[in-house]
Amino acid sequence: MQTAFCRYDLRFKAPAKTSRETLHEKTTYYIKVWDPSDPSRFGIGECALFRGLSADDREDYEDILATLCRRLNSSEPFDISRFSSIKFGLETALLDYENGCCRTPFPSAFTEGKESVRINGLVWMGTADEMTLRADEKIAAGFRCLKFKVGGVDFNDELRIIDRIRCQYPPEKLEIRLDANGAFTPDNAMDRLRRLAVLDIHSIEQPVRQGQWDAMAWLCENSPIPVALDEELIGVDDPDERRRMLYYISPSDIILKPSLCGGFSGATDWIDRAEAQGIGWWVTSALESDIGLNAIAQWTAAMHPSLPQGLGTGALYTNNFTSPLRLHGDMLGFDPAAEWVFPRLQWSL
């Protein structure tokens, strides 16, 4: 088996603003595996590094990928347990290869075009007018669950936007989720959660910055809005530490981003530990291209989730791949008759 990797720079159609930063471009990496006797058949995965957020974000990232490929090509061991994005990409590539090199790492009724996954619409941060327009567009497109990024602009402006949406669409017509990306502080979080709670909010992800277990545990116990852990899961690789954190903080839910929380094997372990403690979960993509998004969507669909999932649609980028993923209203599906179209990629062994 041969292995190679390449870099690819994804370009946003419009700046994507979170409470952490404004994104114009995102660098990602792909890894490919194949049998030298038949190089036309290959498995591919996305090592979806998220600069500034991934636990394996480091200056020598490309050197690590190069070392991994050299080791695999010479049948030498290489420990990738601490490199979540690389683990995510390699797991995808190997499963793709094992399942026929057809970009179906998790074959199911979803990849046969028989089932779809309901997703939420994501409203990025912006001015009040921008966020209102984005919300209206998502609702008009058929979304019955919206997630708002909050914490990046004036809180009172955000509150007014969400209040306007809620007045127009009652809870039985629209579910509203929030994602603070850790933008609140232990001092102001509870006041903000109480003010938001009157708007019938489904949940809020990561209200305060990760690593503050005491503050987060107190919020989870006392918040009028169910609290979900998101960034808190990043970099927690030890199984005992995962169990201890979930027990100590006791969130309502956890948000699973396979490229950030240990690949598919790591995300599965998180699910097992959460369910053992009565904690809910749903899956969210993390700005992957359609290579990574396709794998996440297939993995998610195979678990038959009942809640809307936080999966992207690949529409953020000007230079994404053409894939069989299809969006109909708020249902993400897969067209098995459609073909992948790859740009020219420069692979390094």
Annotate each language-model stretch with its function.
Residues 69-76, 252, 277-283, 305-307:
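A short pocket-lining beta-strand/turn micro-motif at the edge of beta-sheets
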Residues 47, 206, 311:
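Active-site donor-binding loop signature of nucleotide-sugar glycosyltransferases
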Residues 121, 255, 310-311:
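Structural signal for conserved beta-strand scaffold positions within catalytic alpha/beta enzyme cores
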Residues 153-294, 298, 317-328:
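Catalytic core of soluble alpha/beta enzymes
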Residues 1-176, 181-183, 187-190, 195-197, ...:
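N-terminal capping/lid subdomain adjacent to the active-site entrance of alpha/beta enzymes
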Residues 298-304:
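Oxidoreductase and adenylate-handling cofactor-binding alpha/beta cores
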Residues 304-315:
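Short helix/strand-capping turn motifs
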